[in-house]
């Protein structure tokens, strides 16, 4: 069960705003749209981010260029594309202000660019229908690298939640808590039991290690790897979230969640195309996941095996 996940960050950037058939199109066709993801919780560290530039016609930016500034200082000057795409890297700290300045060329409608974070996730874009100004202003926000790596809803009391520390350093878990709802949430978007499970100051999880919260009467194979007990874990239809400590019913920060904060789903929520995946199954986070879902359970659960962050195992499979 204690998998000691070895998460490797692979820059498999989803350059979804330039499909293959967008190259060599008519010069009057606008660049495709980009959906900008929501910023997420900060952590203290420096990261390398990416400026990714495209030309939908494939003949370069024809005199256009972009400058990128961090906290008012130009760090990338006169960046341009000579073919269909270009990639450059720059460093940011949490809270840095990132701005771009655009210089027009002959065919701006061919041009678009996006800023990706350290994990290949699109943070902002320009030169699209959503942002036709060709300029970006955003504040660098880093994900919290702590998340649920396993969840088990087994027979009888064989239940646990496993929390993984992917920060690269020792983590004091007292900064976090588990907040939950029972049989759906009484009020949509509000926790029935905020700060339901808390952690004593000095509860240290080593880098790359996990912390297991389990039912006190769970199987010996679970308790042998356990760190803390909790009587009321999920029966399949009870949402559990990793939150920042100090959560209240309607004021909280979700780092990761299993289940959603709406009505009772019935037996459980579907996961990876498996009906009632949170009921009578073990869920294991894929090794490609490096941070929590920030409360977006639907995207995390997915509707297909490939489109989910989770691997669904049979009940009582926690080997």
Q: What is each stretch, according to the model?
A:
Residues 93-96, 134-142, 213, 268-290, ...:
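Short, surface-exposed secondary-structure junctions/capping segments
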Residues 113, 224-226, 294-296:
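A short secondary-structure junction signal
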């Amino acid at each position: 069960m204690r998998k000691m996940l070895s998460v490797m960050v692979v820059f498999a950037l989803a350059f979804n705003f330039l499909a293959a058939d967008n190259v060599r199109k008519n010069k009057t066709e606008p660049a495709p749209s980009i959906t900008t993801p929501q910023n997420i919780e900060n952590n203290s560290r420096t990261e390398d981010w990416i400026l990714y530039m495209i030309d939908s016609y494939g003949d370069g930016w024809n005199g256009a260029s972009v400058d990128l500034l961090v906290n008012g200082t130009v760090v990338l000057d006169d960046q341009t594309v000579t073919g269909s795409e270009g990639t450059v890297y720059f460093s940011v700290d949490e809270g840095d202000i990132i701005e771009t300045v655009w210089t027009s060329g002959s065919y701006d409608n061919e041009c678009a660019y996006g800023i990706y974070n350290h994990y290949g996730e699109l943070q902002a874009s320009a030169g699209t229908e959503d942002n036709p100004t060709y300029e970006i202003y955003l504040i660098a926000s880093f994900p919290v690298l702590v998340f649920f790596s396993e969840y088990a809803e087994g027979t009888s009391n064989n239940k646990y939640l496993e929390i993984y520390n992917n920060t690269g350093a020792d983590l004091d878990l007292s900064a976090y808590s588990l907040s939950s709802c029972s049989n759906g949430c009484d009020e949509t978007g509000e926790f029935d039991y905020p700060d339901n499970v808390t952690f004593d100051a000095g509860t240290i999880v080593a880098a790359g290690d996990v912390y297991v919260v389990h039912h006190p009467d769970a199987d010996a194979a679970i308790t042998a790897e356990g760190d803390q007990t909790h009587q009321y874990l999920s029966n399949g239809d009870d949402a559990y979230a990793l939150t920042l400590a100090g959560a209240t019913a309607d004021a909280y920060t979700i780092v990761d969640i299993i289940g959603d904060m709406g009505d009772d789903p019935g037996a459980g929520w579907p996961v990876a195309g498996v009906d009632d995946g949170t009921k009578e199954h073990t869920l294991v986070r894929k090794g490609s996941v490096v941070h929590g879902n920030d409360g977006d359970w639907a995207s995390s659960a997915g509707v297909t095996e490939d489109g989910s962050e989770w691997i669904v195992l049979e009940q009582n499979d926690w080997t």
